[in-house]
Amino acid sequence: MSETDAPDPRAIVLETVAKLPNLPGVYRYFDAEDNLLYVGKARDLKKRVSSYFLKNLASPRTALMVERIARLETTVTRSEAEALLLENNLIKTLQPRYNILFRDDKSYPYLKITGQEYPRMAYYRGAVDKKNQYFGPFPSGWAVKESMQILQKVFLLRTCEDSVFANRTRPCLLHQIHRCSGPCVNFISKEDYALDVENAAKFLRGRQSEVLETLQGKMLAYAEELKFEQAALVRNQINALSRVLHQQSMETGGDADIDIIAVIVQGGRACVNLAMVRGGRHLGDRAYFPTHVDNALASAEESIATEVMKAFLAQHYIEKFIPGTLILNTEMDEPELMLALMEQCGHRINVVFQPQGQRRQWLEMAHKGAEISLARLLSEQGSQQARTRMLVDALGIDVPDLESFRVECFDISHTQGEATQASCVVFHHHAMQNGEYRRYNINDITPGDDYAAMRQVLLRRYEKVANGDGVMPDVVLIDGGKGQVEMARQVFVELGLDISLIVGVAKGEGRKVGLETLVFVDGRPPQELGKESGALMLIAQIRDEAHRFAITGMRAKRAKARQTSRLEEIEGIGAKRRQKLLARFGGLRGVVDASIEDLASVEGISRQLAEDIYKQLH
């Protein structure tokens, strides 16, 4: 078949569009090189996809993308909610060029109240269950801890671990400073403690007035029974709760859980600021910075803001808690998206664009926070991009796209040969990529042999890359001088990798920052960049992060080894008995503090063995 007889890709695409069903689903556009351009969802695939191929498209960016479409794929789903879920997964996994992308963050923290006889409250992050009560989510760990402090002041709930609670014979410091009612030593009845837990839960759900009425009734009842000491304790609770309510902005309407979302677009970047109100209390906010905003399929910043808002709602809430009310600073008409979210969460969502009163103040705060966060990002981004450019120029690297420039840095850490660990940190997209950090436990080497440790970690890291699996960075940064760099060279030669990627950072005289020398293995002479060099500042930032990451891992490993090793050295203490001792006394420190009688009370520990344990630990 001649070139003139070859089928027209556009004709094939239009033919495919004409055959699409009027059903919900997800569509994907590809260019001639089979690169994924865009992923979208639709209630009606045929109607939605056909709209892209109209003659007069409102957005020039959309028209530009449509010109590049060489083929399309579709997946039919049972509902629009299912399409929303699939679209979200594909966007996050495949990262199409024209989709606005919000990077996955850690799950939000919760405040947990356990379902035990004497419940404890705790900071929690992870999947929720039905055995315990969970309140949140909260925008930050700080917000959870602040709420816990309030509950300690007002309701005196315990926060201690169960092993500590079960073995206390006298109240702890928290009871002495009036932050715990002392249920561990029966200073409060089970019924009164349960009432405090119930009131704490009501407070977190926004039923503060009801809690105040309950406490006032309880205080009057104690007074009538001439139990003035108990009445005074309840009065203190009322005063503490009143102070909290006075200090914080409280929502008095019917819906106590609200999310306030403000979007700002400027300079090709966007910021989404999410503020959370839970139980009527404003818990703070969190800023998000999506990528691919400069490729968004919109014609103006106002339209891009709408696209960013839609992308945030779809990607953020698809697997997270959605409150009953959303307050947005960007108006949009997206009934299909909201119906899909409501189907996903199982309850009605009230969307507000023009709030009044307290809610208006909250939206203004969120909007201002977005402006400040975006201004800070643009400022930092400008300086960080400049440093990246300086480093690329200083090393003489040919990088077609500065955004893709990638550095991996290695550091070895140990204490006199104990608990040796190697760390690898990653710099990419002008920022440290925490999610790509890795630690490597180093085994089967002579203690303290940093060269052998470096050889082991580099082999483990790049053996797969040499076999075609994984990504090779533009620079491999080694925290060390000629010896470490020579070991890296040997590994790269062995694996058939480019040795010019290796850059060593030799510490200067007195280990002073700014006096470092860059060491190469491909014939280039050592290079001193100078104290004021932006390139050196970036190298120092990456190297220091690798060192920090290695040190924290090494300390944790060493502490764990020491905690178990002291008990392992005692004859007659196996894994099961060791576990029982640690569980009973809440850790090695508790075992050390225990008396012989306490040790002998543990199942499987005889009097003689208890004496042996006590002697070994003292």
UniProtKB/Swiss-Prot annotation:
GO terms for biological process: nucleotide-excision repair; SOS response. It comes from the Bacteria. GO terms for cellular component: cytoplasm; excinuclease repair complex. GO terms for molecular function: DNA binding; excinuclease ABC activity. SUPFAM superfamilies: C-terminal UvrC-binding domain of UvrB, GIY-YIG endonuclease, RuvA domain 2-like. The keyword Secreted does not apply. CDD domains: GIY-YIG_UvrC_Cho. Its main location: cytoplasm. Residues 209-244 form the UVR domain. SMART domains: GIYc, HhH1. Keywords: Cytoplasm, DNA damage, DNA excision, DNA repair, Excision nuclease, SOS response. It is found in: Cytoplasm. Residues 22-100 form the GIY-YIG domain. Belongs to the UvrC family. The UvrABC repair system catalyzes the recognition and processing of DNA lesions. UvrC both incises the 5' and 3' sides of the lesion. The N-terminal half is responsible for the 3' incision and the C-terminal half is responsible for the 5' incision. Interacts with UvrB in an incision complex. This is UvrABC system protein C.
